[in-house]
C-alpha cells in the first residue's frame, strides 16, 4: 500500500480517464438513435411525398399543366398567324388607300380636263352657231343680190335690145 502522506486518494486508472457525466458510449448511442430517428422521419416524408406525387390530384394537375402548355402553344401559334394576317391586311389596306388616292387624283385631273373640253366644245358650238348665222346672212344677201341681178339683168337685156333696135332703126 502507498504511504499515507499523499494528499489524494488512490483512484483506478480507467475511472480517471472517463469524463464526468455521460460516457462516450452513451454519446454514440444517442447519436445513433438520432440518426435512426432522422432516417425514419426522412423515409416517412419520402413515402408521404411519393404518395402525394402519384395521387390522382397530382396526376390531374400534371395533365392539366400539359394541356395548358399545349393550349398556350396553340394560342401563341394562332396569335402569330393572326398578327401576320393583320400585318398583311394592313399592308393591303395601305396599298388600297394609296390606289384610292391615286385614282382620286386621276379623277380630279379627268374632271378638270372634261370641264375644259366642255368649255371648249361650248365655245366651238357658239362659234359654229355664229358662223352658221353669218353663212345664212351671206346666203340671204346672195339670194337678194342674185334676184336683183336677175331683175336688173333682165332689164339690162331689155334695155340693151331696145338700144339695139333703136340704133338699127336709126341706122336704116
Curated annotation (Swiss-Prot):
Residues 1-26 are cytoplasmic. The chain crosses the membrane at residues 27-47. InterPro entries: BST2 (IPR024886). There is a cross-link at residue 20 (Glycyl lysine isopeptide (Lys-Gly) (interchain with G-Cter in ubiquitin)). GO terms for biological process: defense response to virus; innate immune response; negative regulation of cell growth; negative regulation of cell migration; negative regulation of intracellular transport of viral material; negative regulation of plasmacytoid dendritic cell cytokine production; negative regulation of viral genome replication; regulation of actin cytoskeleton organization. Residues 103-149 form a coiled coil. This is Bone marrow stromal antigen 2. It comes from Rattus norvegicus. The gene is Bst2.
Amino acid at each position: 500500500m502507498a504511504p499515507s502522506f499523499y494528499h489524494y486518494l488512490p483512484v483506478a486508472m480507467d475511472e480517471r480517464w472517463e469524463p464526468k457525466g455521460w460516457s462516450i458510449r452513451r454519446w454514440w448511442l444517442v447519436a445513433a438513435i438520432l440518426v435512426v430517428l432522422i432516417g425514419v422521419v426522412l423515409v416517412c416524408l419520402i413515402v408521404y411525398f411519393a404518395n402525394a406525387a402519384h395521387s390522382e390530384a397530382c396526376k390531374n394537375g400534371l395533365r392539366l399543366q400539359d394541356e395548358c402548355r399545349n393550349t398556350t402553344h396553340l394560342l401563341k401559334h394562332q396569335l402569330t398567324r393572326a398578327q401576320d394576317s393583320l400585318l398583311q391586311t394592313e399592308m393591303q389596306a395601305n396599298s388600297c388607300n394609296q390606289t384610292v388616292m391615286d385614282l382620286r387624283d386621276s379623277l380630279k385631273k379627268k374632271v378638270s380636263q372634261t370641264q375644259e373640253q366642255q368649255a371648249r366644245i361650248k365655245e366651238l358650238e357658239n362659234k359654229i352657231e355664229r358662223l352658221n348665222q353669218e353663212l345664212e346672212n351671206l346666203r340671204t344677201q346672195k339670194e337678194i343680190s342674185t334676184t336683183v341681178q336677175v331683175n336688173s339683168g333682165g332689164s339690162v337685156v331689155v334695155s340693151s335690145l331696145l338700144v339695139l333696135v333703136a340704133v338699127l332703126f336709126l341706122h336704116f
